[in-house]
Regions:
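Helix-rich catalytic cores of soluble enzyme domains
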Residues: 144, 150-153, 164-168, 208, ...
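DPxDG-like acidic metal-binding loop motif
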Residues: 149-184, 188-189
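Generic beta-strand structural signal
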Residues: 126, 133-135, 142-144, 160-164, ...
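Alpha-helical interface subdomain recognition
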Residues: 2-65, 71-81, 244-287
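Short Gly/Thr-rich strand-loop-strand
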Residues: 134-136, 188-194, 202
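Glycine-rich flavin
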Residues: 47-57, 62-159
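Short Gly/Pro-enriched turn/cap motifs at secondary-structure boundaries
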Residues: 125-127, 192-196
Length: 287
């Protein structure tokens, strides 16, 4: 029996904390790139390729991917720390990163071994899509023939794989699947008032054969991965992804408000800048 301290385990919280450090440093180094491209992302209605490429180089799309497949396999709280920091600089970049991490993490963590091998066989996967069952999967020899159309494919512009969900024909059973993006049709429909840069377009597949090893049941799926993160249900695995982004943009709003208050005078009161007013200081403190 091993007597090594539990902190020496690659799946320990302490080990995850060590892997978090370079990711946070990478986000800091990309801060100017995020912020200088934010407006362009809104105009293009997708992340600029330069931003997506930089995040790829910084390994920011594989924070929830198992160690065995080259991912960071961060503890949920450490993943939240990184997501909060990205959102502080650019919420659209954070949203696309969140989707890529969650969908890749689910597929890498719960697909059969052969399916994960397919996913990681070539260029490292950046996945996009969602798991609402908007399709039908017809059983076929060795897999399923899937037809459906899904919305909110955030990050699909820079992705190379898609994920989706479908009801198995004639049942209420839900199937998750993944396929190369080249097998799907993408629809340019993302004309919205906010989060334009996420590029959350629709996508579809039509009678696409997906081998069984690239599918998994939505309920009761078990993972063969060794990390603690993959012992929890999929719904819990992805449940911490949105809240840290809300914290990040809230912190940015407070900081921007304080900066604005430093140069905003209240001439009617005879007081100088807004930053000097006690009610304002109290409100910032409460926030």
């Amino acid at each position: 029996m091993s007597t090594a301290p539990i902190t020496d385990s690659p799946t320990s919280v302490a080990a995850s904390e060590l892997r978090r450090a370079p990711l946070l440093a990478a986000v800091d180094s990309l801060a100017e790139l995020f912020e200088s491209n934010g407006r362009q992302a809104e105009l293009d209605r997708r992340l600029p390729q330069a931003v997506a490429d930089a995040m790829r180089e910084a390994d920011l799309f594989w924070m929830k991917t198992p160690l065995e497949l080259g991912g960071s396999e961060l503890h949920p709280l450490h993943f939240a720390d990184v997501m909060e920091q990205i959102a502080y600089h650019d919420i659209s970049a954070a949203w696309a990163t969140m989707i890529g991490n969650g969908t890749t993490g689910v597929m890498a963590g719960w697909l059969p071994e052969a399916g994960a091998d397919d996913l990681f066989a070539g260029e490292r996967p950046i996945t996009a899509g969602q798991f609402t069952p908007r399709g039908v999967a017809v059983p076929a020899d060795g897999g399923y023939r899937i037809t459906g159309r899904w919305g909110f494919g955030s990050g699909i512009g820079h992705a190379n794989w898609i994920v989706g969900a479908a009801f198995i024909e004639g049942t209420h059973d839900i199937l998750f699947f993944t396929a190369p993006k080249s097998d799907a049709t993408v629809y340019d429909v993302w004309h919205v008032a906010a989060l334009q840069g996420t590029g959350s377009n629709d996508y579809s597949v039509d009678d696409l054969f997906v081998p069984e090893h690239r599918t998994m049941g939505a309920y009761g799926a078990t993972s063969s991965r060794t990390g603690h993160c993959f012992r929890m249900p999929i719904s819990i695995f992805i449940s911490n992804e949105i809240s840290p982004m809300a914290v990040g943009i809230a912190k940015r709003a407070i900081d921007d408000m304080v900066d604005l208050a430093k140069s905003t005078a209240r001439s009617l009161t005879g007081v100088g800048d807004l930053i000097d007013r006690v009610p304002f200081q109290k409100a910032v403190g409460q926030a």
